[in-house]
Swiss-Prot record:
This is DELLA protein GAI. The keyword Phosphoprotein applies. Residues 9-20, 147-156 have a biased composition (Low complexity). Residues 457-533 are annotated as: SAW. Residues 320-352 are annotated as: Leucine repeat II (LRII). Transmembrane segments: none annotated. It comes from Gossypium hirsutum (Upland cotton). A motif (DELLA motif) lies at residues 37-41. One of its GO terms (cellular component) is nucleus. It holds the Pfam family DELLA. Probable transcriptional regulator that acts as a repressor of the gibberellin (GA) signaling pathway. Probably acts by participating in large multiprotein complexes that represses transcription of GA-inducible genes. Upon GA application, it is degraded by the proteasome, allowing the GA signaling pathway. InterPro entries: DELLA_N_sf, TF_DELLA_N, TF_GRAS.
Amino acid sequence: MKRDHQEISGSGSNPAESSSIKGKLWEEDPDAGGMDDELLAVLGYKVRSSDMADVAQKLEMLEKVMGTAQEDGISQLGDTVHFNPSDLSGWVQNLLIEFNGSTTTPDPNFNDDSEYDLRAIPGVAAYPPVKSDPGLEITRKRAKTESSSSSSSTTTRPVVLIDSQEAGVRLVHTLMACAEAVQQDNLKLADALVKHIGLLASSQTGAMRKVATYFAEALARRIYRIFPPDSLDPSYNDKLQIPFYETCPYLKFAHFTANQAILEAFSMASRVHVIDFGLKQGMQWPALMQALALRPGGPPAFRLTGIGPPQPDNTDALQQVGWKLAQLAERIGIEFEFRGFVANSLADLEPEMLDIRPPEIEVVAVNAVFELHPLLARPGGIEKVVSSIKAMKPKIVTVVEQEANHNGPVFLDRFTEALHYYSTLFDSLEGSGVAPASQDLAMSELYLGRQICNVVACEGMDRVERHEPLTQWRTRMETAGVSPVHLGSNAYKQASMLLALFASGDGYRVEENNGCLMLGWHTRPLIAHLGLATRWY
């Protein structure tokens, strides 16, 4: 095996600036107790913060009384429903009177003011309750609206009993409200909202809770400008990609469909050269090498150029991957040559560095799986790389990218799109059949969580997760003179068979879009594979 190693020095992104918030972001208003609660005001309600403890105390008393009433066989109010009351405190007091008799004395410390609408009190999910019995679960019960007659002549009024589904809706609305406050640079409101997001998320389970937690963390990092020290370390992401590869079919689909396109392009060639823009652990290439070894007429001479980022411990990870692939090539009888290039950015590469041979001697393929979108953070980066690709004169260029729009100019739009996109991804992870407590699943979620943090918390050159939809990539490439090619129905059929390995394929969908392949969860496309060819061919 021949192997060369080169390091390309280039200007990378500056490390994310970290700053800690000293003291408070704003001064507290000493008269704030009489003001409207700003968290609820932004959601459209008028509620005084000073009223909340009193209402919570009355709800606690009502829970105790209702429990006693059920034991005594008094059930006329057990199914009473009170829908959208304008005076929640007064209604609770009336119920206490009906249970305990007209001699019950209202709490002297509670001042009722019907001017304020207490409908929106989120309960224990959003506000820590006053000390109460563990049985206080009024926010967890199913909301229902039905009427029943009481022993008195007064008209029955409905009550809102909030369940976890309603809390989930409120969680999403609060996430959106916090993102809007961030966009408007309202740090006081954003700070209040992001704290309540964590409390609301605790009332959820499964994918919703995990997604909300990651988005809350990302919002908090953006608000307080606190970033993890390894937020821009690509080598760490490369390691996290391994369990993500094992847990769900997205990377396997990307590698499989790219290999199929490359294999078809190499069908008649005696010498082939693959330039991998992101070698990582080299997981994509053993399958292609084995397919080439079985080719009728014998395998071609296979040359692989792998590009990767510098390692924090200065180890030569590319060399280690190259040696493993060389051992495989020797076992299956393929002539193999490997070269590794260390680069901070693909924009630092020049075609002359890669020893490109004439097309009549060697057929070239360029492979870019989730590698092009970070170039959008660097002015002129994507244009430079596309120009280099054209100079390499490849027969096939395989591009796999996230089918999402996380690169718009408006923060709230990016946040909304990211919330929908990653909610679907986390949902698919839970449906992939992996044990919920497995380490691979936890690492896969961390892999996606780091992407969420970058999309939401970072800006400028530090924001590298700039995903764009297939239509934009196709237009960009066509404008640069790199034309899409049809991937073929064979790749579609085999990709569909691949999905059967993951929870029998339930939920995953492959679709063809103008010659491109997309993999999604139910009706939402999540990644797209675009095959390209230079006009030289």
